[in-house]
Amino acid sequence: MATEQRPFHLVVFGASGFTGQFVTEEVAREQVDPERSSRLPWAVAGRSREKLQRVLEKAALKLGRPTLSSEVGIIICDIANPASLDEMAKQATVVLNCVGPYRFYGEPVIKACIENGASCIDISGEPQFLELMQLKYHEKAADKGVYIIGSSGFDSIPADLGVIYTRNKMNGTLTAVESFLTIHSGPEGLSIHDGTWKSAIYGFGDQSNLRKLRNVSNLKPVPLIGPKLKRRWPISYCRELKGYSIPFMGSDVSVVRRTQRYLYENLEESPVQYAAYVTVGGITSVIKLMFAGLFFLFFVRFGIGRQLLIKFPWFFSFGYFSKQGPTQKQIDAASFTLTFFGQGYSQGTGTDKNKPNIKICTQVKGPEAGYVATPIAMVQAAMTLLSDASHLPKAGGVFTPGAAFSKTKLIDRLNKHGIEFSVISSSEV
């Protein structure tokens, strides 16, 4: 409930940023959802009132909502001003943090939210940030009874919830899953805003600290159920999808593994092994990506190399990333398919000595990943946090999407909003 002390259910922080403007549009759509009994009280937050006002005016024009600007609160807030972050958090039930790269700008928002009793959702795809925040703030968030949920965009809700969906649909014990991401584009091709590119550069350039963080965490290994899932070669051919694939370098594997650990340790659910890949089509695409990958991995090791990668994203990514981001036509024509191939054991079959005897294939399909599916996932995660509290983990804390939402109706919400989960096949072998 909105109150005088906390007047907004949702606050979109960074609403005037490239991704934030799309999240703002999605919240505006949710505000007038016919299934809602009342209007959603919400606000946008950022450094410039003029920029925030322009974002609201643009959304109003696009959605045919001329009165939108007068219906939405505006909060002036600067990541460099902790007092302004406190004031924002005091007014929100849930903060949707769209300000990245999160390794530089994410922690002050989380700290302000915890100290002032607001929950926070972000769309980070940065494993080091996500794992560090869980290590530093899980107990503090639990003490305050608030939920800090990272990676709630395309990274990594489709993968994390997709594995849970696959497990729920298997008539037996799921032990291992491989996922294959396929990105579909229209005649004008693909383009991704360079904010994502920067996050990848900083993440790959700091792999040693991620390893140190995991050593400090000193977590016990999760038990291995069934045969160990074999890693594919850096370039492999997927017969089922009739195309080549490479390992997916996003946060999905890190997030899914953390979820599986939580479900095993807290809910006594059998852990699932997981590997993630992205399909790249034919041999020409493979060669192109090999060169791009070699360039990236060479330059990202050095400070001056990282500066060059950041300054010339279009050149070093072979045209996939740009400072301008995608056009509306590119966004409208794009979509994704995430295909899961799972294996496990039918009910009553022992997992110790027997080979897996059941297979399942599921899919998650949706619109353009970065600026349509991500806002949908983020906003529906927030709405689930607001409306399905009885099925969340009992105490607050820092969670992955799967850990927070495995018992909620988030998958149903996503299905209704264009991110569709389905079973393709299931069979005993």
UniProtKB/Swiss-Prot annotation:
Q: Name one Pfam family in it.
A: Sacchrp_dh_NADP
Matching Gene3D superfamilies = NAD(P)-binding Rossmann-like Domain
> What InterPro entries does the record point to?
NAD(P)-bd_dom_sf (IPR036291), Saccharopine_DH-like_oxidrdct (IPR051276), Sacchrp_dh_NADP-bd (IPR005097)
* Biological-process GO terms, alphabetical: glycolipid biosynthetic process
For this UniProt record, the keywords arranged alphabetically read as follows: Acetylation, Oxidoreductase, Phosphoprotein
Q: Which residues carry this modification: N-acetylalanine?
A: A2
Q: Which GO terms describe its molecular function?
A: oxidoreductase activity
| Protein family | Belongs to the saccharopine dehydrogenase family.
Write the protein's name: Saccharopine dehydrogenase-like oxidoreductase
Which source organism? Homo sapiens
Name the gene: SCCPDH
